[in-house]
């Protein structure tokens, strides 16, 4: 019983490693232009999230000050 469980686990690991190898074979290093574009989009997303957090934070802070005089 334990031997079959071990074989199942090893087969699962072997399949996973095979899939990882397939992905690595088709992937490539991004070009400089792709890297710059990805960096810009990521930076814009981070700034947008920060702005949304700030917009939520400011009214809540003022409402707390109005409620607890």
Curated annotation (Swiss-Prot):
Main localization of the protein described in the UniProt heading: membrane
Pfam family, one: SecE
Amino-acid biosynthesis is among the record's keywords: no
Subcellular location: Cell membrane
An example Gene Ontology molecular-function term: protein transmembrane transporter activity
One GO BP annotation of this record: protein secretion
Keywords: Cell membrane, Membrane, Protein transport, Translocation, Transmembrane, Transmembrane helix, Transport
Annotated TM spans: 43-63
Membrane topology: Single-pass membrane protein
UniProt cross-references to InterPro entries, sorted A to Z: Prot_translocase_SecE_dom_sf, Translocase_Sec61-g, Translocase_SecE/Sec61-g
Record's GO cellular component terms: plasma membrane
Domain of life: Archaea
Quaternary data: Component of the Sec protein translocase complex. Heterotrimer consisting of SecY (alpha), SecG (beta) and SecE (gamma) subunits. The heterotrimers can form oligomers, although 1 heterotrimer is thought to be able to translocate proteins. Interacts with the ribosome. May interact with SecDF, and other proteins may be involved.
Assigned protein family: Belongs to the SecE/SEC61-gamma family.
Function: Essential subunit of the Sec protein translocation channel SecYEG. Clamps together the 2 halves of SecY. May contact the channel plug during translocation.
Protein name: Protein translocase subunit SecE
């Amino acid at each position: 019983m334990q031997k079959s469980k071990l074989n199942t686990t090893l087969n699962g690991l072997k399949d996973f490693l095979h899939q990882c190898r397939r992905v690595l074979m088709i992937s490539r290093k991004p070009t400089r232009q792709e890297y710059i574009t990805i960096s810009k989009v990521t930076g814009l997303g981070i700034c947008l999230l920060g702005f949304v957090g700030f917009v939520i934070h400011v009214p809540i802070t003022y409402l707390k000050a109005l409620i607890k005089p």
